[in-house]
Structures are given as structure tokens and as C-alpha cells.
């Protein structure tokens, strides 16, 4: 049993099995689709996800993806992609990464969040260029573990099986907080490098108020947590 502390950003507690979501980007495999075509394809995908969110009264998440489309259409980013580098994933991702680093260095939380948005869009664009499909199979009572999480990630997941979210990074304005609140599930952010302690299928108990996580709790701790959860219900 191991205890990890982060920042609780939603009420409630839950116990479930860890699903570690790795949204890594592969910069060694060249793109099968050139930059401009990939942008159009990704915008179409985001537009479909926006419609689905709006149809389910999840307007905040739809607004996030609207902002993602604006990033893809931002001339300060797109005009840096030259014709000879339209298939170079390193070149494309490097431009998104540089733009994000400028904003991340600023003090304002708004700009830090926008930096995370640019990185997220860059990752999704690289996957689109490579025609990479990310498949996530979430079983019932899953605790979703990730470095960061956005509506672009969760829109293709069966979030009905998720009972909690744990993030390595993020602040109170992170998009994962919006997702968690809309779904009514606890969320703990900012656990840092301690997230590496969590493996797939570990039992994880989290308290969305205190920010405390317990990895593989013993029988006594698990009984206490289940009692607390019943009182909340």
C-alpha cells in the first residue's frame, strides 16, 4: 500500500482499477498524410466531436474543441510549415512545441493552459498525419491515469466506465477538471512523478476533496474507504 498526495479538485471518493493512458507522440515515423490534409481531417473530426458534446449538453467540452480548431487555423503556426516539410512530423511538432513553450513561460494561468492546448493539438495532429488510431478499452470501475487529459482524448473513450481521474500535471482550470465535473466523478491533479508508481490494474482509491490517493490499499483501508463512499451516497 502506498499513499500519494495531489490536489483534489472535485468532491467525492472512488475505488477502482487503474488504466494508464499514455498519449505519447512518435516523432520517428514520417507522416502518411501531408500537413494541410491532416489539418482538414482533424478539424472534421473535432467538428463531429463538438456536435456529440453539444447533443449531450456538454457545452464546456465543445468549447474546448472549438478553441482547438482555432489553433489549427492560426496562421502564426500554420504559415511556419514549409512545402518541403509538410510530411515531417518532427518539423510540425517542433513548431507546436516552440509556440507552447513561449506561452508556458508566462505567469498567467490562462497562457499556461493555452500552452497545454497547443501541445495537445500538436499530438493529435501528428497522430492524424501518421494515420494512427488510439484505442482505449476501459472496463467498469476504471480510474483513468494520465499526464494530462482533454475532451479530444475523452470523446472517443467510454467514460461511463470511469469512476475517477488522476493527472500528473494540470491546474484547477485544466480541461480534465471540466470533464470530471460534468461526469460527476472525483478528480485529483498534480501528483507529479508519483504517477509512475501506478501501474495498469492496480487498485486505486482517491479522495477528490483532499487529493489523497492510495495505491493497492490493504483490506482495512479498503473497508474504511468503502464506508466513506457509502456515506457520500
Model-based region annotation:
Residues 1-233:
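Non-catalytic, soluble scaffold/interaction modules
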Amino acid at each position: 500500500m502506498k499513499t500519494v498526495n495531489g490536489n483534489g479538485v472535485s468532491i467525492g471518493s472512488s475505488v477502482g482499477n487503474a488504466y494508464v493512458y499514455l498519449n505519447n507522440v512518435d516523432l520517428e515515423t514520417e507522416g502518411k498524410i501531408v500537413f494541410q490534409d491532416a489539418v482538414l481531417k482533424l478539424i472534421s473530426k473535432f467538428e463531429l466531436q463538438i456536435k456529440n458534446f453539444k447533443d449531450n449538453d456538454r457545452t464546456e467540452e465543445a468549447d474546448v474543441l472549438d478553441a482547438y480548431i482555432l489553433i489549427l487555423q492560426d496562421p502564426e503556426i500554420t504559415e511556419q510549415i514549409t512545402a518541403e516539410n509538410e510530411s515531417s512530423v518532427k518539423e510540425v511538432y517542433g513548431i507546436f512545441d516552440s509556440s507552447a513553450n513561449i506561452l508556458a513561460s508566462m505567469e498567467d494561468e490562462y497562457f499556461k493552459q493555452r500552452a497545454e492546448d497547443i501541445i495537445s493539438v500538436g499530438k493529435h495532429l501528428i497522430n492524424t498525419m501518421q494515420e494512427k488510431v488510439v484505442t482505449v478499452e476501459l472496463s467498469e470501475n476504471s480510474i483513468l491515469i494520465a499526464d494530462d487529459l482533454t475532451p479530444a482524448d475523452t470523446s472517443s473513450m467510454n467514460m461511463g466506465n470511469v469512476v475517477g481521474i488522476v493527472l500528473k500535471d494540470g491546474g484547477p482550470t485544466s480541461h480534465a477538471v471540466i470533464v470530471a465535473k460534468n461526469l460527476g466523478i472525483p478528480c485529483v491533479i498534480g501528483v507529479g512523478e508519483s504517477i509512475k508508481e501506478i501501474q495498469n490494474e492496480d487498485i486505486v482509491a482517491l479522495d477528490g476533496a483532499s487529493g489523497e490517493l492510495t495505491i493497492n490499499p490493504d483490506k482495512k483501508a479498503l473497508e474504511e474507504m468503502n464506508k466513506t463512499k457509502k456515506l457520500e451516497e
